[in-house]
Design a protein with these regions (language model features):
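Structural detector for short beta-strands of small beta-barrel domains
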Residues: 1-18, 53, 75-77
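General beta-strand recognition
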Residues: 13, 21-23, 70
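Beta-strand/loop nucleic-acid-binding surfaces
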Residues: 29-41
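A short, structured loop/turn motif at beta-sheet edges
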Residues: 41-47, 77
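Flexible glycine-rich surface loops and low-complexity tracts that mediate binding to linear polymers
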Residues: 46-60
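OB-fold/S1-family single-stranded nucleic acid-binding modules
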Residues: 58-77
Length: 77
């Protein structure tokens, strides 16, 4: 795993705010906001995924659902 990266196991959710976007609700109870969205094949409600991501505390966003993450890799489970 790259330096500074974390692994997130969770469920893909569609959030119907600000025009709608896809997020990942982690098994830890935190909703993560992928900074560049999710690729089309992962845009499925309730899809279980594992992400390797970096927290991007240096960025702000309009979604306001949880921390912004830079997805380094994603796999459906």
């Amino acid at each position: 795993m790259p330096s500074g990266a974390i692994q997130i196991d969770g469920t893909v959710r569609y959030v119907a705010l600000e025009g709608g976007f896809w997020a990942v609700r982690g098994d830890d109870g935190v909703t993560y906001d992928p900074m560049n969205g999710l690729a089309a094949q992962y845009q499925r409600e309730n899809l279980r995924v594992t992400l390797v991501a970096k927290m991007r505390d240096d960025l702000g966003g309009v979604h306001m659902v949880g921390p912004i993450v830079e997805v380094l890799s994603i796999q459906a489970r």
